[in-house]
């Protein structure tokens, strides 16, 4: 009996180790080309509006994919979906590396990578829930969370060094390391019984078309793209009201409190993602820093601080409540953006401090948004509601990156607002920082006031 227990425990630990590896490289995949965006723009002679699609393409299929994999996990089984995700992710990596000299091929590769990598966050938590004993699940979730935080922390430093001393194209090969998990996970995970069920393919296609064309509009400002996007969303809304098992529950749209929380949370997440994508351009243009310096000196301390801020945020939520922590997070974000607006041309290390507080504020916000949003849901709405929040969070990051890329390409924004003498290279970035601050303040105030007066029990 003890031998059987030891073997079972060993199997669970082995599963957890390989899940941690998948989680780590899933995070690296998200940010792998972020610090290299200026280099990519220079190599292809493209404006930020086009170059940022290197990240937007990944986040688009990644966000949609997380929702799709989650819904398919019962019908097709975790084992099959994980294998499919890993293979597709690696296939995208190979295409991107081999075809890195062709911009359209690079974008296509990032679409493919996102479609594969989406399996990792969507299914890792399901594997833990199904395979890890109840008494050890808390530790397992905590370990995976720590691995993700570590990936977010060391990622910019690693990719910055590789891009600077070798070439940014080699960053596309990093996700290939996940292929080593395949034989072990296939052996450790059980064969699952497939459950028949309906899958809303038409709904996914309509929503995806609407999202893609909206993002194209934000980077090109072509009205035709906006018209196609609006029409797709209108048909999508009509569709989900008719089908029995829609991709998105239309009943959630009637929950105004929930929708405000999801929308404002998404705006905050998207704004910060857009800012982070702007940092490499800003540091190159204003302070002439190298890719290695941007990754390891400017961004690295901020990403590492997320671990500390996440821990502090959790303690404050228990002691003072989520709205108190949300207020602090919004204050960190808005004040940081406003301070950077005035002092952007000072020494480059100043931006390191700004990023620490920006990502700290984001950590606080991400800690509490799920808590306050879930309070507006009925018990039977919880699963669909939290899935929609998760989907919106990922999607908003891709949308934010696309929008900021478009804004960086608008000459009208490259105007002087401050009366004092500032370097011309700071005009565009300072104006956007002021815009970011305003967006954060409005979104934060709306969320806090709406939920404060809702009398919800957090």
From Swiss-Prot:
Q: Tell me a GO cellular component.
A: plasma membrane
Summarizing the function annotation, the protein's role is: Resistance to tetracycline by an active tetracycline efflux. This is an energy-dependent process that decreases the accumulation of the antibiotic in whole cells. This protein functions as a metal-tetracycline/H(+) antiporter.
A Gene Ontology MF term for this entry?
antiporter activity
The protein here is known as Tetracycline resistance protein
Q: Which family does it belong to?
A: Belongs to the major facilitator superfamily. TCR/Tet family.
Topology in membrane = Multi-pass membrane protein
* Record keywords: Antibiotic resistance, Antiport, Cell membrane, Hydrogen ion transport, Ion transport, Membrane, Plasmid, Transmembrane, Transmembrane helix, Transport
Taxonomic source organism: Streptococcus agalactiae
């Amino acid at each position: 009996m003890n031998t059987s227990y030891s073997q079972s425990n060993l199997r669970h630990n082995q599963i957890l180790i390989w899940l941690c590896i998948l989680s780590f490289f899933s995070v690296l995949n998200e940010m792998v080309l972020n610090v290299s965006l200026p280099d990519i723009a220079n190599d292809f002679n493209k404006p930020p509006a086009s170059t940022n699609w290197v990240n937007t393409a990944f986040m688009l299929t990644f966000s949609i994919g997380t929702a799709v994999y989650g819904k398919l996990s019962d019908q097709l089984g975790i084992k099959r979906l994980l294998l499919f995700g890993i293979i597709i992710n690696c296939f995208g990596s190979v295409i991107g590396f081999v075809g890195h000299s062709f911009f359209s091929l690079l974008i296509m590769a990032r679409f493919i990578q996102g479609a594969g990598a989406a399996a990792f966050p969507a299914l890792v938590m399901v594997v833990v829930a199904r395979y890890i004993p109840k008494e050890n699940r808390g530790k397992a979730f905590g370990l995976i969370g720590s691995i993700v935080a570590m990936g977010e922390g060391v990622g910019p430093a690693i990719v910055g060094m590789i891009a600077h001393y070798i070439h940014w194209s080699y960053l596309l090969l990093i996700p290939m390391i996940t292929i080593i998990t395949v034989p072990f996970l296939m052996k450790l995970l059980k064969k699952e019984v497939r459950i028949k069920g309906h899958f809303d393919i038409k709904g996914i296609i309509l929503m995806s078309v609407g999202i893609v064309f909206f993002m194209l509009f934000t980077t090109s400002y072509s009205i035709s793209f906006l018209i196609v996007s609006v029409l797709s969303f209108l048909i999508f809304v009509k569709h989900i009201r008719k089908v029995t098992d829609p991709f998105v529950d239309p009943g959630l749209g009637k929950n105004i409190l929930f929708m405000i929380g999801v929308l404002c949370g998404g705006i905050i997440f998207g704004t910060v993602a857009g800012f982070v994508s702007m940092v490499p351009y800003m540091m190159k243009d204003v302070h002439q820093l190298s890719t290695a310096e941007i990754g390891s000196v400017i961004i690295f301390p901020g990403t590492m601080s997320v671990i500390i801020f996440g821990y502090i945020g959790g303690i404050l939520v228990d002691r003072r409540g989520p709205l108190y922590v949300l207020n602090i997070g919004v204050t960190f974000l808005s004040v940081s953006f406003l301070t950077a607006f005035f002092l952007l041309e000072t020494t480059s290390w100043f931006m390191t401090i700004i990023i620490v507080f920006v990502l700290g504020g984001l950590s606080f916000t991400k800690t509490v948004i799920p808590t306050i949003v879930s309070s507006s849901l009925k018990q039977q709405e919880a699963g669909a509601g939290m899935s929609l929040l998760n989907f919106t969070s990922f999607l908003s990051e891709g949308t934010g990156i696309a929008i900021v890329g478009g804004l960086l390409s608008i000459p009208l924004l490259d105007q002087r607002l401050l009366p004092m003498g500032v370097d011309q290279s700071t005009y565009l970035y300072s104006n956007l920082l002021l815009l970011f601050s305003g967006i954060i303040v409005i979104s934060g105030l709306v969320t806090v006031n709406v939920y404060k007066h809702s009398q919800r029990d957090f």
